[in-house]
Amino acid sequence: MADKNFLTDIIDADLAEGKIREIHTRFPPEPNGYLHIGSAKAIYINWSIANQYGGKFNLRLDDTNPAREGEEYVNSIIEDLHWLGADPNGGIFYGSDYFDQCYEYAEKLIKEGKAYVDDLSREEMREYRGADAGKPSRPSPYRDRTPEENLDLFRRMRAGEFKEGEKTLRAKIDLASPNMNLRDPAIYRIKYAEHHRQGNKWCIYPMYDFAHPIQDAIEGITHSMCSLEFENHRPLYNWVIENIFGTAFPKQREFARLNMTNTVMSKRYLRELVEMGIVDGWDDPRMPTLCGLRRRGYTPTSIFTFVREAGISKSDNLIDMRQLEACIRSELDLTAQRRIAVLDPVKLIVDNYPEDKTEYFDVANNPNREANDTTTRKVAFTRELWIENEDFAEVPPPKFKRLTLGGEVRLMGAYIVKCTSVDKNPDGSIAAIHCTADLETGNGNPADGRKVKGTIHWVSAARCIDAEVRLYDKLFTEANMNAIPEGSDYKDYLNPESVVACTGCKLEESLKDAKPGDKFQFVRTGFFTPDSKNPGVYNRVVTLRDSFKPAK
């Protein structure tokens, strides 16, 4: 549930004053790309506030720009909201559903002398408006056309008599305003492109700043909450509402975007990464997209926990991605069952163990006491095992507590073994490690009371499965990608080690039944999930630990 913040304070005041009786919010993404972690903040705010106040939450696909939108993105957005558990109880709508009403309201403004058809080009219009708020503006030569002439031209625009850019419908507001958005903004433009829902019915389309408040009002939205870059657009939002509907609601309010380290949120950049083949699609586990995070192994709970901890304010800030990692790590530590995986295997042969024998040890699925999981599983033990290469050293460094020549170590959940010899390949690399097991230590400590400090994991060579394990890291080396030097190429900051593929890994055989969406802790290694696209591949969700301390 949403915490108290400045947005809920506004809503509380509106309810207390009797201005509204039911809260109605919406999430209005443009279907021209995939949702990302920043989108999750907007979803969470609108969905959770509606939930908190027993109100309604709409999903509206803002498909008013036919050139960039498509069903692929529409379907992905709906799927992402469902996955997050933020299903819109108020319904799913499309901006294009309101094209007829938008057109009628545009004609209303024209008839009232509040809108006019302009012949200036985009560049001329910008120059006449003053280019920026610090320069004076001057009226278009076409500003004083009569309502009758404007209505005729607007209808001819709709009929397809003019080329793109030849005519534009502008609101007649205030050319002297210090707010550029009120200097007679464009509210309709000509665009010859097939719409994914409307086909070729329309060749004129409403601008976002005109369509958005109309859509909000028609749907009964009470609080139109959007990101901070729309704050200067609020006076125009209010102008549209007042001049078309004559009401005080909907009310637009703004919050700061969610910016995260070591990634980019720009749809243009993300699309470029996909189209150039730098990443494996929009759902590449390194991407900040929700489908990418899902494939990586993140959960809806961890994402919404991260958004809530990041806070809701009007101040821009940069959130360390390690805070997101901390959220999923805390969750999986309690929920993920433990399994054994050897990523860089070397053969360990227990010489005093029968070749034809297979023994099964009961191993805890989750030894974390807070998980309250008392279940166990059977893990096969045989004469030949696989252990991690790094868990053996012929010449150990100081404080090395794993297996050494002549040294002892505990095989996790099984016997204590002592290394007796090593077989080597012609190039000097280790082919196999030989050891003997203290066969009296399968269920406890040595009878003579000797202490064995090291414990390593292992899998049976005869009862394991082969897999590829992908170790994912941050996509960019630069923490603040919004602050890279002007003119530099963001791709120069790509992390060359953002994914390391480990092949020939040996995994506990119980993982043969694992499905995409399942989460596991590979003991001593990290948290992993089966890849949804490639059978036999596991993706690292997050490492076991990190020095980062999340904000409280």
Regions found by a protein language model. Give the residues of each.
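Active-site cores that bind ATP or allylic diphosphates and position pyrophosphate for catalysis
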Residues: 63-65, 71, 108-270, 328, ...
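Secondary-structure transition/capping motifs at alpha-helix termini
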Residues: 16-19, 48-56, 82-89, 217, ...
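Long, charged, mostly alpha-helical binding arms that flank functional sites
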Residues: 250-327
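A glycine-rich helix N-cap at a beta->alpha junction
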Residues: 73-100, 105-106, 113-116
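Conserved short loop/turn motifs at secondary-structure junctions
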Residues: 28-32, 60-68, 91-100, 123-124, ...
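Core subunits and conserved enzymes of cellular information-processing
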Residues: 230-234, 238-240, 304, 308-311, ...
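N-terminal catalytic cores of NTP/NDP-binding nucleotidyl/phosphoryl-transfer enzymes
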Residues: 3-12, 16-79, 194-227
